[in-house]
């Protein structure tokens, strides 16, 4: 008995010692705005609390700065990478997202996000949360005296945050708000989609070509999602001409990693021309100059560019398939466009601009998307 007491005493001391030496878990705190919404059980939080994933009939909300949101919408509406009957990787001249409804929330009021990220990151996080609640139900911020803010829309089943900055400044807070209500928000971001696409492709070393303001978004996501992959964020400044800028990016990467090699470059841009970039890559392969030879040694034989539109399109298809969220309706994808504007309370609300927008834009050309198996 004495021996047993001695053993128990030693064990207790060891447990106490271990507890004293444990490093407390680092918990990221959400913004006051989320706590404010959670305290209001009659308003926005009630909408979130009663939220379901909206099932197969919900919409796919694409949220972001106008240019990125529209570019991504174009790719999603025209994507044709699989056979719609059996899911084989074979275009069948039918939209892959047939029957789906896309709500494109063009956040003109708060753009450019890079300004908010630099001056007030918490403000950008608040913008992301407010837009997500709008995607759940736009009446959350309606004003009885302002008819523009009283529109109704389909409840979102998936949230696509079409800006890399929202991965760092917003996604966590949107997810936290829904978790506080005991609900799940299905959220996609270009940062995570591109990193996971690189991992799926077997990349071991990649460069992320992104603005300095987006550095932490990629670095933090890489630590979570691709810890075994070497990820280097490279920012360039210049006159904006794409092909020389690509060479500048390679030069900076070479200075950072003198013996490094690249399986891919992730493009933090919805408008960069893959045609121009691939043409410059082929020019480098010809090794006409010493610089060409130096850069060619960096690029591995299977080097590729990974851009957000293709990565998000593939990620969305896989997600809908894995979670069985496809509508399975036999119809072309439906799309509605919304633009944020200031209401009478001095806050931003969505205003539908589908008619005006669709009449001024032609049907998008089919976009390339990566393999989805």
Predicted regions and their residues:
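Sec-dependent signal peptide recognition
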Residues: 3-12
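Non-catalytic structural scaffold of enzyme domains
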Residues: 21-373
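C-terminal motif of bacterial Sec signal peptides marking the signal peptidase cleavage site
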Residues: 17-19
């Amino acid at each position: 008995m004495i021996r047993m007491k001695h053993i128990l005493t030693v064990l207790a001391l060891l447990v106490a010692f271990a507890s004293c030496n444990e490093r407390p878990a680092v918990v990221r705190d959400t913004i006051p705005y989320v706590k404010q919404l959670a305290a209001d059980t009659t308003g926005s939080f009630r909408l979130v609390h009663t939220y379901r994933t909206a099932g197969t009939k919900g919409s796919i909300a694409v949220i972001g700065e106008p240019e990125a949101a529209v570019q991504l919408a174009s790719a999603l509406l025209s994507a044709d990478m699989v056979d719609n009957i059996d899911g084989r990787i074979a275009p069948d001249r039918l939209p892959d997202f047939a029957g789906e409804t896309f709500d494109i929330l063009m956040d003109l009021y708060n753009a450019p996000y890079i300004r908010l990220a630099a001056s007030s990151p918490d403000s950008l996080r608040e913008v992301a949360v407010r837009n997500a609640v709008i995607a759940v139900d736009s009446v959350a911020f309606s004003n009885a005296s302002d008819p523009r803010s009283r529109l109704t829309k389909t409840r979102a089943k998936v949230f696509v945050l079409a800006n890399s900055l929202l991965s760092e400044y917003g996604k966590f807070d949107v997810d936290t708000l829904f978790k506080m209500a005991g609900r799940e928000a299905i959220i996609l971001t270009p940062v995570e989609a591109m990193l996971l696409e690189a991992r799926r492709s077997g990349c071991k070393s990649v460069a992320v070509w992104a603005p300095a303001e987006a550095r932490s978004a990629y670095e933090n996501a890489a630590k979570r999602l691709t810890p075994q992959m070497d990820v280097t964020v490279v920012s360039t400044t210049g006159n904006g001409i794409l092909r020389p800028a690509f060479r500048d990016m390679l030069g900076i990467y070479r200075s950072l990693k003198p013996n490094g090699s690249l399986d891919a470059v992730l493009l933090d841009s919805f408008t960069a021309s893959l045609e121009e970039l691939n043409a410059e890559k082929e020019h480098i392969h010809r090794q006409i100059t010493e610089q060409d030879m130096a850069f060619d040694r960096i690029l591995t034989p299977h080097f590729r560019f990974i851009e957000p539109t293709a990565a998000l399109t593939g990620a969305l298809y896989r997600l809908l398939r894995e979670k069985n969220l496809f509508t399975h309706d036999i119809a072309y994808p439906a799309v509605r466009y919304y633009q944020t504007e200031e209401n009478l309370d001095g806050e931003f609300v969505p205003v539908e601009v589908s008619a005006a927008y669709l009449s001024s834009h032609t049907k998008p050309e089919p976009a390339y998307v990566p393999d989805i198996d």
